[in-house]
Amino acid sequence: MASTGEPDRKRRHFSSISPSEAAAAVKKQPFFWPSSEDKLDTAVLQFQNLKLSQKLEAQQVECSILEDKLSQIKEKQLPYNSSLKTVHKSWEKLTASVESCSVRVSDSSSGAHRFVNKEDGSSPAVKNDFINRLLETGATESSSSNICSNQMEENGVNTSSQMTQTLYNLVAATEDLRCLKDELYPTVLRTNLGKDLCGQLALSELESEIKSFRGDLDDVLVKFKSLSRELQSHRDADAKVRVDLKRIRGELEDEVVELQQCNGDLSALRAERDATAGAFFPVLSLGNKLATSDRERDKQRDLQDMETVLKELTVLASGRLQQLKNLHEERTKMLGKMSNLQNKSKSVRCISSSQACLSLKDQLEKSKEAVFQYMALLEKLQVEKDSIVWKEREINIKNELGDVSRKTSAVTDSRMASLDSEIQKQLDEKMRIKTRLGNISRERGRKEIFADMKALISSFPEEMSSMRSQLNNYKETAGGIHSLRADVQSLSGVLCRKTKEYEALQLRSADYASQLGDLNATVCDLKNSHEELKLFLDMYKRESTDARDIAEAKEQEYRAWAHVQSLKSSLDEQNLELRVKAANEAEAVSQQMLAAAEAEIADLRQKMDDCKRDVAKHSDILKSKHEEHGTYLSEIQTIGSAYEDIVPQNQQLLLQVTERDDYNIKLFLEGITSRQMQDTLLIDKYIMDKDIQQGSAYASFLSKKSSRIEDQLRFCTDQFQKLAEDKYQKSVSLENLQKKRADIGNGLEQARSRLEESHSKVEQSRLDYGALELELEIERFNRRRIEEEMEIAKKKVSRLRSLIEGSSAIQKLRQELSEFKEILKCKACNDRPKEVVITKCYHLFCNPCVQKLTGTRQKKCPTCSASFGPNDIKPIYI
């Protein structure tokens, strides 16, 4: 803006606007000075506070709504918790029943005899592999381990231990049955050996079938392992999906934060726009109008850009929500597949009803029939086997007799050589121990070290007591010095008192001396007056007198006066004599007192000198004692430091002593051990000698036994009969074993039926648990969707509120702009803008209206009717 006058005229021009219009403008729009553009008006702050309070109330209402929804969801979850508890209880009952069944099976099978075939060593490995696979895949725990509660996680260890125990019991029972079969197989093979080739072929076929059965079982286990791996992969995929969900949620939260920041920027821009709209005075120039229009265009452009970004973000958020829905559906499908796979892998019925298991059962029945056939063949082959065995025994006895003699001689020779080498080693060890003991005995004895240490330790208290006595003496001497100091102080006090008395006596003697001087002066005056009187008398005697009467009268007068004077002088002399006597007596007394005081002062000075000498002596003694005390303290410190140095040395010596003791104890123990070893070696040597004697006796015994072999052959027939009886006993024991086998089979069938029932219950409970988990997961997903929809609705509401607030602000700005335009219009015509100012009253009008007024005679202002001339009209530029 360019005005026509000085600053005072500008101020008048500003004040030319009517006060009502200015008040209305202030009420409608807050006023900002150009120097405080960053400050807000109180009205704007109140308006913002009101908005914030409204937002807070809305957020409180939303929080209360969300809390109600959360309480409703918790109430919905209560029946699920009770159902989960019932499922856990049923699962615990089922595991307890399975464990009891396995314990009964293991107890029933514990009496059976176990025999492991060395040729087929795969059965324990298969058992351990089967149990490890079951435990690795989590067959003993719930199928959804990722979603289970904290209580299931806490009780998982106990349940897993119980299930492992039950599995071990079941596998042990099956292993007992297998061992029994493996025990029966060699007996059958021995009985039927060499009887029939067809039997051998059947046995080989049976063996191959059993091996194929085992291979099928291994294949089943491999399939089970593959299924468990697939299940684990599905679990890993589920975990990955959850991680992706978390990541997507984090991205959504970041985007929400960005949106909130954008909303904050929008609100800040709007506040700046409001501030800039109200920061300038309504009377603006054309350049400012263009600048504000450009700013409004820029802000509108920014708003449009932000709206487009917001739309893109909403589209992206909807796409992410759709992805989340798809992922949730895939996850539910995967959970269903996982539950089906787990049920298939953990159900005994499926395994038992599989084709491989049925074929194995058929093969097992066929093998049982073949076993019974081969039992009959075994009975036939037993007789031939006995004859062959007797012949083999005869040959073996002959061979063994020769081998025994050779082996005994070789064993005795090797044993003798080993014993000689061990004896030599023990002798070397004994010599080494003796040398070590001799070296130890040469070293300084322990008693001498202890005696030195005791003497050193006993000398310390004596030295300390002597030092303490010296310190006590020093303390006593220091106490005597203190008493002497007290005596000196008392004597110095007495001396001061005597000196004060001496000064007082000196003052008195000075007074007496002054009095004596006064008396002497008076005596001198009297003597002078007496001489003057004598002179006067001589003068009067020499004077010449005319008449004799006058002379006589004068003589009488003079005589009388002389008599009076003589009386006076005599009186004065007497008084003076009395006073002189008194003064002399007082002087004598004072002289005596002074002499006594001087004597006392001399005595006190002598005593003081003696005390000073004593003090000097004692101070010298004290200094020497202090020096000695310092030396003693330094010696004590050196002794203390030496004692402190000696203490660690003493500790080191004690440690060395303890180490020596430990070393001596070790040597003693080593000596004991060496003695024990020597004793054991002597005992072994004695035993070896006995063994050698026994070997020689055994050789003689074998030589005798060779002569008795013929006698033993005679008894072979008797032994044959005994063997027949043993055969009968073995057949009886075989029948008993078959009965036990039948009982075990019945118990196993019962255990299998119970196990199938328990597995069916477990499967049913797992299915119910899986369904409940699916429902719970769906409920959680729905809850999350509702929460996300609520957040989206909140964002929409906030966006709509911001749009509504922005539209209301734009309307206000437009109204204010129209008002400013009306203010800038001419008040005379209300059509054209203000272009001219009248400098008399500083009112603004358009140029045509002013020209009309100048054309008339009465040139007066239309607003204030003030007269003006053509020179008072000045143009302005807005």
From Swiss-Prot:
PROSITE patterns: ZF_RING_1 (PS00518), ZF_RING_2 (PS50089). One of its GO terms (molecular function) is ubiquitin protein ligase activity. A zinc finger (RING-type) spans 826-865. It is found in: Nucleus. InterPro entries: E3_ubiquit_lig_Bre1, Znf_RING, Znf_RING/FYVE/PHD, Znf_RING_CS. One of its GO terms (cellular component) is HULC complex. Residues 1-21 are annotated as: Disordered. SMART domains: RING. Residues 48-76, 200-261, 293-382, 537-624 form a coiled coil. Its EC number is 2.3.2.27. Disruption phenotype: Plants have reduced seed dormancy and several pleiotropic phenotypes, including alterations in leaf color, plant architecture and flower morphology. It catalyses: S-ubiquitinyl-[E2 ubiquitin-conjugating enzyme]-L-cysteine + [acceptor protein]-L-lysine = [E2 ubiquitin-conjugating enzyme]-L-cysteine + N(6)-ubiquitinyl-[acceptor protein]-L-lysine. Pfam families: zf-C3HC4_3 (PF13920). It comes from the Eukaryota. May act as a tetramer consisting of two copies of HUB1 and two copies of HUB2. Interacts with MED21. This is E3 ubiquitin-protein ligase BRE1-like 1.
